[in-house]
Amino acid sequence: MGLQKTLALSAVAAGIMLSLSGAQAAPLLSSSEPMTINASDLAAKEKALTDFPLMEAVKSSIQTLDNSAVEQIEPGRAANPANVRRVESILKEADWDYLFPMRAPEYTYSNFLKAIGKFPAVCGTYTDGRDSDAICRKTLATMFAHFAQETGGHESWRDIPEWRQALVYLREVGWTEGQKGGYNGECNPDVWQGQTWPCGKDKDGDFLSYFGRGAKQLSYNYNYGPFSDAMYGDVRPLLDKPELVADTWMNLASAVFFFVYPQPPKPSMLHVIDGTWQPNDRDKANGLVSGFGVTIQIINGGVECGGADENAQSLNRIAYYKEFANYLKVPVPADEVLGCKR
């Protein structure tokens, strides 16, 4: 089952259970008679529960390009997808080299364009009056600010300023390919994570290690599996070969994937940036309003947000965002909420 289906599955099942439990004439089932839900009932309920504009926007935003087409993307190629050409018009390879001078060699400009191309909604064209180029610039500034915090060198003594020290780490510090015992406690086939995303094994029959790899430092089988499903339509490829998240264009696609996919109950970062997400009354009561600060909530709110003061990590993200925004000509309004303190 693809991730688009997974987005609504729990809501669908819950809705069916509620509908069935509300039927006045339905007899109670004994514990020895498990309830059976037909696939057609699930499909009908899914359609009913997802037939509204926001869900349609989510489904549209997570559409992906076939990998065979992604592999053809190269800088300057006339046949590149429209969203890739937009990025190329805003961010040249020379800009990439300037902004990320300390990057690991695997984080190439070509790989970044492929990662963008995989998700056509990123830097895509809006036909409802929104400024597509402006949204793309803000998307890149936001994404790069989080790159700098997640994989940055954070070495203040260098001549290169910290905001330009992103993408230093390809693999989690202290881990190498083939190393055993990394982030695979949930591989146990007796637990639901191990059943849903069955871990690959090495030649010795030991579970593979799912330590942090790529620009998002993707970790654990329960993150590799969904990412693999989005990339291949199958959970197995990256569960069997997690090293691909470091050694191929997946190293940057993993971060774009996280940018595009909502983290329920949080919206996607893309929908925060492009204005699709608008805070409701409860959001506003909790201090959640449109702006860069909400993207910090999405990416690491449990650790960095909610205190009386901004913590060190969120302050870094804010500082990096301002620098990237300035470079990419993204206006930062004085009243934009950039942080996530209480």
What are the residue ranges of the model-derived segments?
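Eukaryotic endomembrane system proteins
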Residues: E172-G225, D229-Y232, A255
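A short, structural micro-pattern
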Residues: S10, S209-G212, G293
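A general structural-boundary detector
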Residues: D133, G205, K241-P242, N286
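Cell-wall glycan-active module
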Residues: G2-A8, L18-G200, K266-R342
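Hydrophobic alpha-helical context, especially transmembrane and signal-peptide helices
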Residues: T6, K203-G205, A246
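Alpha-helical segment that forms one wall of the substrate-binding/catalytic cleft
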Residues: Y107-P120, S209, R213-K284
